[in-house]
Amino acid sequence: MFSSDELRENYLKFFEEKGHKRIASSSLIPHNDPTLLLTTAGMVQFKPYYLGVAKPENPRMASCQKCFRTTDIESVGDASHLTMFEMLGNFSIGNYFKKEAIAWAWEYVTQRLNIPAERLWITVYLDDDEAIALWKEQGVPENRIVRLGAADNFWGPAGDSGPCGPCSEIHYDFGQETGCGKADCNPSCKCGRFCEIWNLVFVQFNQDKSGKRQNLPAPSIDTGMGLERLTILMQSKKNVYETDIFAPIVEKACLLSGRKYGCDAATDRALRIVSEHSRGITFLIADGVIPDKAGRGYVLRRLLRRAVLFGRRLGLERPFLVDMAGAVINRMSGIYPELKKRQTYVLEMIASEEARFSETLATGLELLEEIVRQTKGGRISGQDAFKLYDTYGFPVEMTTEIAAEKGLSVDLDGFESEMEIQRTKARSSRKFSFDAAATAEAVKNMRHAEKTCFVGYELAIQKSTIKDILTEGGTVDSIEEGDEASIVLDESPFYAEMGGQVGDTGEIITDAGRFEVKNTLHLPNGVFLHQGRVINGCLKISEAATAHINEERRRDIARNHTATHILQTALREVLGEQVQQRGSVVTPDRLRFDFSHLKPMSKDEMRRVEEFVNDKIRRNLPVYAEEMPYRHALEEGVTALFGEKYGDRVRVLRVGRPAVSAELCGGTHVTASGEIALFKIMSESSVGAGLRRIEAVTGREAEAFINLQQDSLSELSGMLESTAEESPRKLAELKEEIDTLKKAVQNLERQMSRGEAEELLSKAEDYKGVKLLVSRMTSVNADTLRETADFLRDKLGSGVIVLGTVTEDKPFFLCMVTPDLIAKGYHAGNIVKKLSQIAGGGGGGKPNMAQGGGRDKSKLDEALQAVKGMI
């Protein structure tokens, strides 16, 4: 019996013998291919070869590729569906075609794997007579060759565009005793009798985004055989979880949960989900995916949270996914060494994300149960689904899955409406300077909708023509002094806000007027809006104008933008290749860069990043841009942002020869890195789970920042009467002395309050059969007040204690109720809530202890006097 590792090696060796070059698996994150969410097939890394934009070292290649598909996540848990899998494949780039592909496939399955030929059926595309003839040459009888349509036997593209073509599949027949039992049953039947084991794709076309197909430069071959499915067959197992691929991982899940696999369907399903998703998230994180609200990160978050949910159903209340990931790494790192190399990072990321979700899971499940109880009409509202998503971190797919188990559906349209409301709010800070709805209406009626020609890469001043003028009221023919408006030019040197870079400012001048441009916006139709106000005179539509940007401001922006590119390279150099850009803002004053990283950067890491960037600045590296076909840029390894939409031609910005940085970028930059002058990090902070932010300055702003720090240090040194070098030590000594004095003061306060508390005991009175102690205390903080109340409660044994004080110039209340009186209905939280309301504030708490405050300290005594009315 073959092990899965032996099958993998056996396949690759077979095709090496056929002249193929063994190629290592690429990452699950497609290399510079924003058209794909994740790597879905073995041919993804070879797309440039199929498209003819690059040439492989050897036109024959074979690989075992990590793949990930997201279409059936909710189905994972049955016996067949997987998210992450390994795809065995052999590939020809214009070298061999159908004849060799079919002959070698048949040879491998019948001679190397020794699968009986009579157990194998073939499917082909409807009109592929050539393939049918070639299968017959291998000895396959015509009655075991089935013609099927495009849904079954036309493959690709992998994404919304790319190589594709008809295909032919090899199916294994489990026999008539399996499945429907019909005499005419064939691989098109879904009864379970047949299992597809190998797909041979005859790559002939390139399909564009509109669905149009063109012939490729040379017909090629792309085959795919799922290792997991093949292993099931070769090890005679019922499903993949019983094979040696998953058995150790399932065993770990059983060990952690105390459950046994194979006892009942619900337990088996949960064990499969935990095991499969643990494998998937381990590989995703190792390849650089981080949890997020969108894109690849959302897929990862869905899997991780679904695994946690089903872990709870197995009784796993404590974090367990780190242990599961460890089992995955132990099983798979021999084949994929990156798992061991990035083990610490992977486990830290999983621990962090699992802990975050665990904090809200229990409360979220309680809320969901309540929603289920109250739901009428069999449908959970979009509002409720959104609350579970936004507040408790429940992916809507998870809510839908749980609801389905209860016989309910979810209003997904309503959920999407709530999401759009949230997105609109998030965009509100970026709206036009005048009413967005009015602007949208004006844009719709714009008289000039042709794209603005941007000339700002080369020019700071440009002769132009005013094509349109927009105001809050719509389009107008002219504007006068003091009017606020947006001007549309046919040609403009102004960079419009895009890609994180702010828009240019400057002036638009005509013979009759001067317009101050305060911002430049880029509309979806490619038109630039030059927003601002008329300084003097008037401006009219169709007038000749001179557009002049603020050149000094542009140079400052360029320094920061180029520095941002070098910074990204520096972060990957210092922190690791898993670092990904998550956002950036480039202004004249500073730059802001958000990136994926689990923990705060150390001082040493920040220093090394600064040193890297400043070294590249001192080298005065050339900074240059060139336009090229998008596909060529990807082949050259240029960094592209996932989710960004790029045209057929792109602008590549490089720093250095050879390039230190190469990114797709439409922004403005310096011509040599030396123009940046100086780079200085101002701060490094967290902006979310697994997300860090660096704010930095360059040039004059960096000098000003350093001078400010030096001035502050000099002032501090003077106050401490020490040198700059000695100041940190002296400040630490001073802080230690202050902490010691604070503790002494607190001890003294406790002694005084204890004495005061002894006196307060005498003020306790019987009121309606209850011991009641109400008092105002002076010169105590909230902590001391709580200690005093604890002392009084213990001394009284039974009673209600209400204390008040003024702390930080605001009233503060604390109430304690002994257990015997709680049983009689007395509630500390209710009492404090009423007291706080009298003082203009709020508060509450548990029946035994509660605290709260107000805004009006003059109401403190009035509130305390009202206590008896609350008893």
UniProtKB/Swiss-Prot annotation:
Gene Ontology BP annotations: alanyl-tRNA aminoacylation
InterPro entries to which the protein is assigned, alphabetical: aa-tRNA-synth_II/BPL/LPL (IPR045864), Ala-tRNA-lgiase_IIc (IPR002318), Ala-tRNA-ligase_IIc_anticod-bd (IPR018162), Ala-tRNA-synth_IIc_core (IPR018165), Ala-tRNA-synth_IIc_N (IPR018164), Ala-tRNA_ligase (IPR050058), Ala_tRNA_ligase_euk/bac (IPR023033), DHHA1_dom (IPR003156)
SUPFAM superfamilies registered for this protein in UniProt: Class II aaRS and biotin synthetases, Putative anticodon-binding domain of alanyl-tRNA synthetase (AlaRS), ThrRS/AlaRS common domain, Translation proteins
Gene Ontology molecular function, alphabetical: alanine-tRNA ligase activity; aminoacyl-tRNA deacylase activity; ATP binding; tRNA binding; zinc ion binding
Keywords: Aminoacyl-tRNA synthetase, ATP-binding, Cytoplasm, Ligase, Metal-binding, Nucleotide-binding, Protein biosynthesis, RNA-binding, tRNA-binding, Zinc
Name recorded for this polypeptide: Alanine--tRNA ligase
Similarity comment: family membership: Belongs to the class-II aminoacyl-tRNA synthetase family.
Recorded catalytic activity of this chain's protein: tRNA(Ala) + L-alanine + ATP = L-alanyl-tRNA(Ala) + AMP + diphosphate
Cofactor(s) listed in the protein's UniProt record: Zn(2+)
Record GO cellular component, one term: cytosol
Gene name of the encoded protein: alaS
Sequence positions that bind Zn(2+): 561, 565, 665, 669
Cofactor notes: Binds 1 zinc ion per subunit.
The protein's Enzyme Commission number: 6.1.1.7
Subcellular localization, as worded in the UniProt entry: Cytoplasm
Matches recorded under Pfam families: DHHA1 (PF02272), tRNA-synt_2c (PF01411), tRNA_SAD (PF07973)
Domain notes: Consists of three domains; the N-terminal catalytic domain, the editing domain and the C-terminal C-Ala domain. The editing domain removes incorrectly charged amino acids, while the C-Ala domain, along with tRNA(Ala), serves as a bridge to cooperatively bring together the editing and aminoacylation centers thus stimulating deacylation of misacylated tRNAs.
Domain of life: Bacteria
Gene3D superfamilies assigned to the protein according to its UniProt record, in alphabetical order: 2.40.30.130, 3.10.310.40, 3.30.54.20, Bira Bifunctional Protein, Domain 2 (3.30.930.10), Threonyl-trna Synthetase, Chain A, domain 2 (3.30.980.10)
UniProt-listed CDD domains: AlaRS_core (cd00673)
Cited function: Catalyzes the attachment of alanine to tRNA(Ala) in a two-step reaction: alanine is first activated by ATP to form Ala-AMP and then transferred to the acceptor end of tRNA(Ala). Also edits incorrectly charged Ser-tRNA(Ala) and Gly-tRNA(Ala) via its editing domain.
Keyword tRNA-binding: yes
